[in-house]
């Protein structure tokens, strides 16, 4: 209903209710494994349409290799790459040097060799933000002691 109301100029953009679906440890749901292919297909469909419904997806995982295991079939690798290509913002944090080649293959032409080379050297709070292949920004998030206490440093 919001989409139609917005198109009829009955709803202002600022008044639209937005949503985000957050998938932490997303590799448990989305990967190039054959068993995950239907989920990848469904997520891609949702991502293609979510903006018109004022929605979005966040996929988080620590290791890019978890999305594309070594024994993956090429057709499933292509599906995962297509899914990633539909995301507007990609935050790439430190990865092991063994993941650099995989990152280069997934984000081909979007990360320079020097940016790929920096990824294993990124420190705590540092990331490269890849904006839909248009621009890359290296940045660092600094947290206060209170924020660190709030998050507890993980398990």
Question: How does the language model describe each region?
Answer:
Residues 117-155:
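Conserved P-loop NTPase motor module
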């Amino acid at each position: 209903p919001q989409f139609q109301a917005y198109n009829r100029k009955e709803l202002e953009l600022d008044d639209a209710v937005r949503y985000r679906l957050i998938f932490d440890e997303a590799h448990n749901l989305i990967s190039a494994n054959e068993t995950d292919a239907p989920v990848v297909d469904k997520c891609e469909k949702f991502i293609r349409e979510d903006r018109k419904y004022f929605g979005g997806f966040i996929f988080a995982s620590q290791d890019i290799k978890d999305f594309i295991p070594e024994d993956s079939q090429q057709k499933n690798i292509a599906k995962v790459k297509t899914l990633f290509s539909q995301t507007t913002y990609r935050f790439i944090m430190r990865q092991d040097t063994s993941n650099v080649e995989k990152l280069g293959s997934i984000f081909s032409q979007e990360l320079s060799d020097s940016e790929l080379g920096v990824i294993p050297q990124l420190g705590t709070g540092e990331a490269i933000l890849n904006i839909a292949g248009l621009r890359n920004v290296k940045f660092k998030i600094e947290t206060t002691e209170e924020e660190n206490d709030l998050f507890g440093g993980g398990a």
